[in-house]
Amino acid sequence: MRHYEIVLLIHPDQSEQVPAMLERYKGLVTAAGGKVHRVEDWGRRQLAYLINKLAKAHYLCLNIECSKETLLELETGFKFNDAVLRHLTVVKSKAETAPSIMMKAVEREESRKAPQPQEAAA
């Protein structure tokens, strides 16, 4: 089995259904004997250019280990799911389990937006 990193751009109106989509895709991988090493929800972000007249999309990143047949089944599901605007699959040499650079940036943005304890007391 090979290691893959999959990045999905989900329609922003379908953000509520992202957890169910993740569970379905993770279940598909594990049912076929694969492993899910990392799942990251990067949230709703600005697109560099319009896709289907949309300026934002919900980003997801999955690092999985599965067979080629399972990957083809996943990609077919992405193509026929109207909520998936784009997907990108990259072959990796090993399993990635550490947080990605994007996830660190998301965490940094969230910590900056959260009110500081000193400000809340004032």
UniProtKB/Swiss-Prot annotation:
The keyword Ribosomal protein applies. NCBIfam families: S6 (TIGR00166). The keyword RNA-binding applies. One of its GO terms (molecular function) is structural constituent of ribosome. Belongs to the bacterial ribosomal protein bS6 family. This is Small ribosomal subunit protein bS6. Pfam families: Ribosomal_S6 (PF01250). GO terms for biological process: translation. The lineage of its organism: Bacteria, Pseudomonadati, Pseudomonadota, Betaproteobacteria, Burkholderiales. It comes from Methylibium petroleiphilum (strain ATCC BAA-1232 / LMG 22953 / PM1).
